């Protein structure tokens, strides 16, 4: 009986902790909620609800690997608990693992056949999978892909090709087959839809015939006119000749502040000029800060343009005497990502030494497709800019070393010891990030409080301890690691016995986290970090993720 009383007491206390965790979650205190759910699990580890709730909190912190683990554990405890599949499916979706997500949402639908929410999410997931299959079918091998940047000459108004590749006959048939797959899913087998299905099949025959012929006659290699002519009525910022000036940048910032777009011609010019500069850089860039001068490092901005302007208000505009390093994740989630990236690129064009840019995990096609940048670019500019930005992001350096003392990288360190700076310099970065290896780990890894290495809470990269940081610094004669990649309540966090600093520059992330932003100023020659924090500023009434995929917004 005493054992039963203790068990009942534990179960009762676990329920109390769950309620406290739920309250913390409602207050957007997701880390606190995770701690409380964990305490509940320690008292009662066979309650599927606790794991599903903790999975949801992990998802809010973008810890999708941990969310998948918790969802899986909830399913193991109770295979008929729909929320376990639901939470795991949502995490798979956020990672772009649509096929895995589809299996989970099919199971949710099976367990809850009359739930309209489950039906809606299953349909969205089916759309995502069909779109993925279609894109896979029409994708072009890297060896056949042409550079869209090389096809654009912004100086030649009204000319230039508008496509970066030529479809083959195989691609044409594959695309048609993929479209047929989409029709099969959405038309179903009901008699009422058979007429529509037949009509669509006829259209597919026409499509195949058209593509088959056009792949041979040069149709896809002919130029499409780019709309580069600046209309007389255009009243926005203008670049005179090839030189991006401070006056132009200031005018552009004022226009952006008032939600006015930059003309496509000047957007092309800025992006293409930036590409040329970035291509010439090594994968690891050495920065020299002269004695008596300072240097500022910023973390993730994530499309929060008005907070970026606030950084410049607090710390001055980028210039040769006031240089910055923005440490990746310029875009996605925030709905002013285009304004952010054009601002950073314009300053790079104005004065290359005024601003340095590092690649983050969100400077990639897979992330941009899900988290809003691709949709925003397509809405505000055009489809060709989607391809162009993807190319330019592949040119971004992966890491920087300041005055041979401070190593700056978006994510973190490595799954093996002995990595030297020369190994990072040798990385061929001109590609989409791989799912493993040094490049992946530079962009995705996170520190952990315990020594050694562990699995990534994100499901990509790894977690590394203070001993790993210490060895890396010693082996490369460095003093400090600065990284970004994680929301911190105060905008920064100092870890690993002061040898690692996380800096995050997007305050009140996604309009809901309530965190501060921060940046770090280093003064030469001692290069001691001076951390400045700041709060979010108002922005126009455009919600974060406004351009993201529908299915992701449904889980936000």
From Swiss-Prot:
Q: Example GO molecular function term?
A: metal ion binding
Give EC number(s), comma-separated: 3.1.3.16
Q: How is the cofactor bound?
A: Binds 2 manganese ions per subunit.
**Which Pfam families does the record associate with it?**
Metallophos, PPP5, TPR_1
Q: Which residue ranges run through the membrane?
A: 171-191, 192-212
EC top class named in words: hydrolase
Entry annotated with the keyword Protein biosynthesis = no
- Changing residue 411 to R does what? Loss of activity; in isoform 2
- PROSITE patterns listed in its UniProt record: TPR (PS50005), TPR_REGION (PS50293)
Matching entries from SUPFAM superfamilies are given as:
Metallo-dependent phosphatases (SSF56300), TPR-like (SSF48452)
Ligand binding (Mn(2+) 1) = 300, 302, 329
Task: List residues binding Mn(2+) 2.
Answer: 329, 361, 410, 485
Note the PANTHER family from the entry: SERINE/THREONINE-PROTEIN PHOSPHATASE 5-RELATED (PTHR45668), SERINE_THREONINE-PROTEIN PHOSPHATASE 5 (PTHR45668:SF5)
Free-text note regarding domains: TPR repeats are required for the binding with phytochromes.
Main function: Isoform 2 dephosphorylates phosphorylated phytochromes, with a preference toward Pfr forms, and enhances phytochrome-mediated photoresponses. Can use para-nitrophenylphosphate (pNPP) and phosphorylated casein as substrate at pH 7.5 and 5.0.
UniProt-recorded name of the protein:
Serine/threonine-protein phosphatase 5
State the encoding gene: PP5
